[in-house]
Amino acid sequence: ERIKSGVLPLDLYQLGSLKFLAPDLDKFACLKLARYAARLGTGACIALNTANEIAVEAFLAEKICLTDIAVIVKACLDDKTIAQDYSQDFGDEVLGLERILTMDKKVRKIATAKIKLLKQGGVL
């Protein structure tokens, strides 16, 4: 459903041209983490996605600040018990659903614990 905003639809032909600049990776920490995970491979991308889901959920529930999302995601990517799962070279192997769900469950548990620690004033 779309809300009527009174604004005309975007017409790219009428706009003419767009200019894209390199993103500031210090300001956009989650983009930096996504690029890092992409370099590491499939398992790291699964870990990043799961940690992000949990962190965003906590933010929307007002349990953490917006800037804590990147902190939680990075802490999960740096966590040794998660890293051992994604540090394996999967190469071109397509991960099965069972393997993905196992990783997802593990990251959810760790991300939730890290959020709890952060809320208690702990350092990640």
Task: Report residues per predicted region.
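Catalytic, metal-anchored helix/loop core of enzyme active sites in primary metabolism
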Residues: 1-124
